[in-house]
Amino acid sequence: MYRIGNGIDFHKLEINLNRPLILGGIECESEFALVGHSDADIILHAISDAILGALALGDIGQYFPDTDPSLKNIDSKIILVKCLELMKEKNFDLVNIDCTVIGERPKITPLKDRITKSLSNLLNLPLDCISVKATTTEKMGALGRQEGIGTFCSILLEKRS
């Protein structure tokens, strides 16, 4: 049996040299930072939501509510690990992921290899089962005005026999 999951996450983008920009589990050299209750890693959040969606287990807000002060600035790797544990408990394995980052800045292409390698390590997936792409909104809307960035992620899970 296979299950497909989709995840999406958006965060406000700001210039902030005192907060790191975290994407796909790596710290990126940038004048930009994402605003959020957690470390605001939009890639790991979208992957985590996709896993939960494929398993029909809700979303990360149910497990890690932004109203819980103890979760302030939580490392998104902790969120992902919890979702992977739930996946294993349900006897599923991750087959592949496909992520698209949407926004004008920061440019993702120079970061793609590092992000993909990080995801490979975090997810225990071969590199050829991980796709990280980027696109813009052609300067339209809030993302086009560089007010934020987002990520869409699709995943495939396979039930262990």
Swiss-Prot record:
A divalent metal cation binds at D9, H11, H45. GO terms for biological process: isopentenyl diphosphate biosynthetic process, methylerythritol 4-phosphate pathway; terpenoid biosynthetic process. Disulfide bonds: none annotated. Pathway: Isoprenoid biosynthesis; isopentenyl diphosphate biosynthesis via DXP pathway; isopentenyl diphosphate from 1-deoxy-D-xylulose 5-phosphate: step 4/6. It is an enzyme of class 4 (lyase). Binds 1 divalent metal cation per subunit. CDD domains: MECDP_synthase. The keyword Signal does not apply. Keywords: Isoprene biosynthesis, Lyase, Metal-binding. Its EC number is 4.6.1.12. It catalyses: 4-CDP-2-C-methyl-D-erythritol 2-phosphate = 2-C-methyl-D-erythritol 2,4-cyclic diphosphate + CMP. Its cofactor is a divalent metal cation. The record marks H37, T136 as: Transition state stabilizer. 4-CDP-2-C-methyl-D-erythritol 2-phosphate binds at residues 9-11, 37-38, 59-61, 64-68, 135-138, 145. Pfam families: YgbB. GO terms for molecular function: 2-C-methyl-D-erythritol 2,4-cyclodiphosphate synthase activity; metal ion binding. Homotrimer. Involved in the biosynthesis of isopentenyl diphosphate (IPP) and dimethylallyl diphosphate (DMAPP), two major building blocks of isoprenoid compounds. Catalyzes the conversion of 4-diphosphocytidyl-2-C-methyl-D-erythritol 2-phosphate (CDP-ME2P) to 2-C-methyl-D-erythritol 2,4-cyclodiphosphate (ME-CPP) with a corresponding release of cytidine 5-monophosphate (CMP). PANTHER family: 2-C-METHYL-D-ERYTHRITOL 2,4-CYCLODIPHOSPHATE SYNTHASE, CHLOROPLASTIC (PTHR43181:SF1). Belongs to the IspF family. This is 2-C-methyl-D-erythritol 2,4-cyclodiphosphate synthase. It comes from Leptospira interrogans serogroup Icterohaemorrhagiae serovar Lai (strain 56601).
